[in-house]
Amino acid sequence: MLFPTEFDVIVVGGGHAGTEAALASARMGAKTLLLTHNIETLGQMSCNPSIGGIGKGHLVKEVDALGGAMAAATDESGIQFRILNSSKGPAVRATRAQADRILYKAAIRHRLENQPNLWLFQQAVDDLMVEGDRVVGAVTQIGIRFRARAVVLTAGTFLDGKIHVGLNNYTGGRAGDPAAVSLSSRLKELKLPQGRLKTGTPPRIDGRTIDFSKLDEQPGDLDPIPVFSFLGRAEQHPQQLPCWVTHTNERTHDIIRGGLDRSPMYTGVIEGVGPRYCPSIEDKIHRFASKESHQIFLEPEGLTTHEFYPNGISTSLPFDVQLELVHSMRGLENAHILRPGYAIEYDYFDPRALKASLETKAINGLFFAGQINGTTGYEEAAAQGLLAGLNAGRYVQEKDAWCPRRDQAYLGVLVDDLVTRGVAEPYRMFTSRAEYRLSLREDNADMRLTEIGRELGLVDDARWDAFSRKRDAVSRETERLKSTWVTPKTLPAEEATALLGKAIEHEYSLAELLRRPGVSYDGVCGLKGGECGPAEPLADDPVLLEQIKEQVEIGIKYQGYIERQASEIERNDANENTRLPDGIDYREVRGLSFEVSQKLNEFRPETIGQASRISGVTPAAISLLMVHLKRRGLGRRNGKAAEAAEQGGGAVPTQQ
């Protein structure tokens, strides 16, 4: 048969994880096949029409810094952009965008269809081909056998998915799509540890039946208009739209309480655990019983539809209760529901059975990414997908896998949390999960990762050129500010007072002035009639110019804190990079408790750093383990990790 059936990498699933995985693998040069049950749903936003948020926006920026598609697609489809926590420090500022669902899908599909080395094929996958302890391909619904050396599984909520509305339920991967029942059964045969989780979505509302005169308007940021990609431009954005705000009330809460006897969550029909940080409205009313009202955001689904997404009332209550609770809210008294809300239960697999590369420990060449690993959210899925696709490509090229460290990226925090701690509920990223968040800001994601991405083969020439110009300009301008001095004689007292609140008493560098509270980069450069500014423009591109100025200002203002954090990272570096031998039996480590040795043997951490973050493994146990490794001559620093760290990359290859 002339039809191609042999590939380097097969990606199963075309959601946010699958599309980033396929693009990353293909950018690596691997001949890649993306299998999806429906090409029309590639990049589909199954739940809310938004990208980013606290912690999540950081992941999107990191995906972008590594050449991924999500940020660029959002710039082309975003109909409202905001910077959250804009009044707080740079570590917790985050970009969030409302997206037009149709435009977003189109942007993703365009990239997939125009990516060299990538083939698309519409077929559901029913089986994996496994020989011994390695995967060798996938079998589709109509029996086509595709062979590959690596398979990336990104099944989302489709694995044995069950949709619940009230006490009615039926199989489905999401509304309107079939569940992957056969594939779920096959994975269970492979004896991988699994469980059930649950998520949900609210009813959708026809905007023509909403009384906006009763609602509070929430516009996006307009000065300046944010962009998501480091290469993005505000001119790429389509028409911008506001969101609207309403609230639940006591009547709403009474309606919900009255329907709990028919709620699948509160009658034991749903067994899976739902997301703590995106709870259903039933859960909110139950958990926060004393709260009189909850804020509900009405978010437009796009420019060519009247559909609105009521963010905050995810529910699996019966449809008649959904209708009544919607009508109880201000502005929605006559609202027409276009689609009912529902909950969905699905299989996930314990991520502690994965390496940090997202390859399964039990089956060589099989990678998992997205909700199959117990996470929730488009952004978490996209980040995992990129990493899994990258490492699948490196696997077939017989190269060491790569995963960023916790001090290097939110992606590193995400993966480390998953593979060392597992999940008891759907995992969502927050800035609070990162202990080094001052160094892991949105604004410096490219500074942290683009150089590594270039070495890995993920970053194209256009991105590399823009990054190189930015990096060099930031370095030059930072040095200029540190080496340019003003004195009481050269800086007029009235100018100093206007900027600093008082005249200067002795010589200061411009960097020292910039460190003062309330002083901006532009303010310092404007001293002496602009003579303190750079002799030549830092960049011709206004977007790049703003990025450079932001980097320079943050780097100087927070220099002391950043250096302190860097010292802490350096102290912990030995543990993070000390690898544990594959075959070590922790029962032989003298002094370890039975509980600790049992956990270490069960979860098989790859490094001392990972072992230290397993629940129940104490600092004393880590000390005993270090002594054991030293005594036996087993512990080793990864040479490539050390080499990459010296070059500024800090990449930590993980064993295949």
UniProtKB/Swiss-Prot annotation:
A GO term for molecular function: flavin adenine dinucleotide binding
Keywords: Cytoplasm, FAD, Flavoprotein, NAD, tRNA processing
Residue segments, region Disordered: 636-656
Protein name: tRNA uridine 5-carboxymethylaminomethyl modification enzyme MnmG
Cofactor: FAD
UniProt source species: Burkholderia orbicola (strain MC0-3)
InterPro entries listed in its UniProt record: FAD/NAD-bd_sf (IPR036188), GIDA_C_N (IPR049312), MnmG (IPR004416), MnmG-rel (IPR002218), MnmG-rel_CS (IPR020595), MnmG_C (IPR026904), MnmG_C_subdom (IPR047001), MnmG_C_subdom_sf (IPR044920)
Sequence ranges of Gly residues compositional bias: 647-656
Alphabetized HAMAP family for the sequence: MnmG_GidA
